[in-house]
Amino acid sequence: KSVRVDAIKPNRMKIELKLGDGQLVDAAHFTGSLTARWLHGTPAADAKAVLQAQLSQIATRFKGYEGYSFDDASKYFGTEEREIVTGTTDAQGSLALSTDELSSLEGLSPGMLSGRFTVKVFEKSGDFSVDQQVATISPYDTYFGIGVATQKSDWGDEYLDSRKEHIIKIVMLDSKGKPEPGSENVLVSVYKMDSYWWWDASTPNSQAHYAKNALNSNYKTLQA
């Protein structure tokens, strides 16, 4: 594909974008900041700024809990784009970012999400400078993890032998991966999948659909 060189405009502003704590974005309490300066150093004052987020599903993982699963298998989150903040920079070229546009992710996402954030700062002419940043988004404050030692078949599939006794480990962590204090009553339901589950769950979307249907075939319920 050919691209006309004159269609590509270099940034005329330097943009500094800070999201969350620099490592994790809290979807329910999104905060951040941006500062825009012209390349010669003058603040880009009174400039319109737009922040967009491209969201996609990722596996939820915490250091030290590699053998645990934290994602809701009955949920699927496809790639989605949202415009989350629109504002105007102050005299110093700065803009505080806050929004509740991501709070609706709670209950929709199976776990953590990846966010590709794109900020555009506009000139009076309509041209704009752009910057991007990728960050992990946490839609939840607390994550329950389930850990169980599985066996592998000759084809490499993991399974549990129903004729044997198994230990199921449960942990409750905050969004930073630290154990939550206190105690909670947990109801654990075990579902037995048929031998063709791998065919019915060949994609992330169909996996979620299969898991939802499996909720109607309870194999065993445990109290913890």
Task: Describe each model-derived feature in a short phrase.
Residues 1-224:
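A structural signal for beta-strand and strand-to-loop patches characteristic of beta-rich domains
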